[in-house]
From Swiss-Prot:
Protein name as it appears in the record: Receptor for retinol uptake STRA6
Note on domains (UniProt): Contrary to predictions, contains nine transmembrane helices, with an extracellular N-terminus and a cytoplasmic C-terminus. Besides, contains one long helix that dips into the membrane and then runs more or less parallel to the membrane surface.
Modification type Phosphotyrosine: residues: 644
Sequence intervals crossing the membrane: 51-71, 98-118, 145-165, 169-189, 206-226, 297-317, 369-389, 424-444, 475-495
Tissue expression: Widely expressed in the embryo. Detected in adult in the retinal pigment epithelium in the eye. In the adult, is highly expressed in cells that compose blood-organ barriers in the brain (choroid plexus and the brain microvascular), in testis (the basal layer of the seminiferous epithelium), in the yolk sac, and in the chorioallantoic placenta. Detected in white adipose tissue and skeletal muscle, but not in liver (at protein level). Widely expressed in adult, with high expression levels in the eye.
The species this protein was found in: Mus musculus
Intramembrane features from the record: 511-548
Task of the protein: Functions as a retinol transporter. Accepts all-trans retinol from the extracellular retinol-binding protein RBP4, facilitates retinol transport across the cell membrane, and then transfers retinol to the cytoplasmic retinol-binding protein RBP1. Retinol uptake is enhanced by LRAT, an enzyme that converts retinol to all-trans retinyl esters, the storage forms of vitamin A.
Protein encoded by which gene: Stra6
Annotated GO MF terms: retinal binding; retinol binding; retinol transmembrane transporter activity; signaling receptor activity
Any one Gene Ontology BP term: camera-type eye development
Residues covered by region (Interaction with RBP1): 235-294
Note: The retinoic acid-induced activation is impaired in retinoic acid receptor gamma-null F9 cells.
């Protein structure tokens, strides 16, 4: 009996076990987990990112050491070579003749890496930050300090990549080729193995890396080309002296007679196309022969375009795919959800589904339209601001006073001017990012309000809230419109008369009566104008937030605008330190033929007979030598004219020596 009971118990338990196991027969077992639909699995690279970045960091440090040895060997004085290594400069921002392509590409690569830090859980690739458990049982990790450290790591990582171009040597070009190929190869390898990423959007990492890949690809082609050219033309020793091609071209363009092509045809005889071209030429930036924008302005413009792309991409992929998923998942249950809030769109549930989907599609279209409008306005204002930069720099170069509020008191460098010059590109990039974000919010609210208050009600014939409000308040709007129209008509036909060709005020009594009677109505008009003033000023400041060449504050408070203050100081440094006219004049002085060195003269106390006879012969042949000294005389006059120009041009005051202020006649100093 006991055995039977035990058998029955075992059968019962096994049966129960079989019954329980049948409950989970459709569940995935063990490691055979199925990913939900639409979820991108985490991709594992063949080589760990920590190992790749450790190799890149080591290679960059080695290249930097080799460049330091090269700079110490080539550029430092031999007697000072044992004191330390010469740190190569990544970019010479004040040089006018250097190519802007390599610095712009390096800055694009650096900024793109910083943009990729936003969704990354590991700011430093060679550190694997694991989440720590909090006392509440939740997983938390403080990544803020590591992201701040990454802001210093990436500039140090790409420092040698930019310094190889500024060294201008065959060995530097070879090191730049190896380093650029290594960076480009690692990025291509990572994106080829893992093109999709579950963070934010599956293709966001790949799309955000396009500027990075373009910049590294350009550098991986530029360095080999420069290496081949240096080997072919034997220019490995580098160029010596001042680079004067741009400064001499600027001087020739400045001194040559200008062609007045625009004045040859009257404005009345121009066609519509020519007028449009002239308007665009005066409104946006077009290249001008003989003038080149400073390197920092070119870099800031490039970074503004890159920042616009990165911010627009982030705004697009973080909202539009989510709205599309929500629209695709709408079913008849949404009618019950809306009914819970007291919203009944229709009695037919299927019609409610179609209406909700159409409204979501309208929101998506308004969002994309606002994003396109924001990007277009940013690019147009960027092109227009480049023309303003050029006009301001040309005015400072010729010594004119700029129409700035407050005006520049002096172009001498100062502490604030140097700090502003250092941070100009970074400020411009940050202002562009924030300006695009604010523009997107304002334009999206405007387009959405216009769509749901005007277009959607007119298409569906329901929810005509705007038309109903106008229907109920039409007496107010009619009164305001009539008051404004009648005041303008009375001002033109009753209170003004033309006397001897000049307008004069008349009917003063009627003018005072109308002013008193219309005071309450004008208060209503003033309230409307106040709202319009707030809207138009907000829109204007939003659109021009990314521009630093104009102040968003009134003239009396323009100095409180940090962006405008930075721009003024930036112009001060550029005008005082990279004046192309000064560089050209100094190059002409350095390249001028120097007189032949003469042997040192003996003391003048006693002359030997031979020297006395030689002096007599020189006195006799003075007239003959004066005939052949015409060329030297003209050269001396040209040098005196150059010195006079350098001394009296107000835009060149920063280049004068302080000793010239106390100079005496014939150059003798006290």
């Amino acid at each position: 009996m006991e055995s039977q009971a035990s058998e029955n118990g075992s059968q019962t338990s096994s049966g129960v076990t079989d019954d329980y196991s049948s409950w989970y027969i459709e569940e995935p077992l063990g490691a055979e987990e199925v990913q939900p639909e639409g979820v991108i699995p985490l991709c594992q690279l063949t080589a760990p990112p920590a190992l790749l970045h450790a190799c890149l960091a080591s290679l960059s440090f080695l290249v930097l050491l080799l460049l330091a040895l090269l700079v110490r060997r080539r550029r430092l004085w031999p007697r000072c070579g044992h004191r330390g290594l010469g740190l190569p400069s990544p970019v010479d921002f004040l040089a006018g003749d250097l190519s802007w392509t390599v610095p712009a590409a390096v800055f694009v690569v650096l900024f793109s890496n910083l943009c990729l830090l936003l969704p990354d859980e590991n700011p430093l690739p060679f550190l694997n930050l694991t989440a720590a458990s909090s006392p509440d049982g939740e997983m938390e990790t403080s990544r803020g300090p590591w992201k701040l450290l990454a802001l210093l790591y990436y500039p140090a990582l790409y420092y040698p990549l930019a310094a190889c171009a500024s060294a201008g040597h065959q060995a530097a070009f070879l090191l730049g080729t190896v380093l650029s190929w290594a960076h480009f190869g690692v990025q291509v390898w990572q994106k080829a193995e893992c093109p999709q990423d579950p963070k934010i959007y599956k293709h966001y990492s790949l799309l955000a890396s396009l500027p990075l890949l373009l910049g590294l690809g350009f550098l991986s082609l530029w360095y080999p080309v420069q290496l081949v050219q240096s080997l072919r033309h034997r220019t490995g020793a580098g160029s010596q002296g001042l680079q004067t091609s741009y400064s001499e071209k600027y001087l020739r363009t400045l001194l040559c007679p200008k062609k007045l092509d625009s004045c040859s045809h009257p404005a009345s005889k121009r066609s519509l196309l020519s007028r449009a071209w002239a308007f665009s030429h005066h409104s946006i930036y077009t290249p001008q022969p003989g003038f080149r924008l400073p390197l920092k302005l070119v870099i800031s413009a490039t970074l503004t375009g890159t920042a616009t792309y990165q911010v627009a991409l982030l705004l697009l992929v973080s909202v539009v795919p989510t709205v599309q998923k929500v629209r695709a998942g709408i079913n008849t249950d949404v009618s019950y959800l809306l009914a819970g809030f007291g919203i009944v769109l229709s009695e037919d549930r299927q019609e409610v589904v179609e209406l909700v989907k159409h409204h979501l599609w309208t929101v998506e279209a308004c969002y994309i339209s606002a994003l396109v409008l924001s990007c277009a306005s940013t690019f147009l204002l960027l092109i227009r601001s480049l023309r303003t930069h050029r006009a301001n720099l040309q005015a400072l170069h010729r010594g004119a006073a700029l129409d700035l509020d407050p005006p520049l008191q002096s172009i001498h460098p100062s502490r604030q001017a140097i700090v502003s010059w250092m941070s100009f590109c970074a400020y411009q990039t940050a202002f562009s990012c924030l300006g695009l974000l604010v523009q997107q919010v304002i334009f999206f609210l405007g387009t959405t309000s216009l769509a749901f208050l005007v277009f959607v009600p007119l298409l569906h014939g329901r929810n005509l809230l705007l038309l109903r409000s106008l229907e109920s308040t039409w007496p107010f709007w009619l009164t305001v419109a009539l008051a404004v129209i009648l005041q303008n008509i009375a001002a033109n036909w009753i209170f003004l008369r033309t006397h001897h060709g000049y307008p004069e005020l008349t009917n003063r009594r009627m003018l005072c009566v109308a002013t008193f009677l219309l005071f309450p109505i004008n208060m209503l008009v003033g309230a409307i104008m106040a709202v319009w003033r707030v809207l138009i000023s907000s829109l204007y400041n939003t659109v021009h937030l990314g521009q630093m060449d104009l102040s968003l504050l009134p003239q009396r408070a323009a100095s409180l605008d940090p962006g405008y203050h930075t721009y003024q100081n930036f112009l001060r440094i550029e005008a005082s330190q990279s004046h192309p006219g000064v560089i050209a004049f100094c190059a002409l002085l350095l390249h001028a033929p120097s007189p032949q060195p003469r042997p040192p003269l003996a003391p003048q106390d006693s002359l030997r007979p031979a020297e006395e006879e030689e002096g007599m012969q020189l006195l006799q042949t003075k007239d003959l030598m004066a005939k052949g000294a015409g060329h030297k005389g003209s050269q001396s006059r040209a040098r005196w004219g150059l010195a006079y120009t350098l001394l009296h041009n107000p835009s060149l005051q920063a280049f004068r020596k302080a000793a010239l202020t106390s100079a005496k006649a014939n150059g003798t100093q006290p």
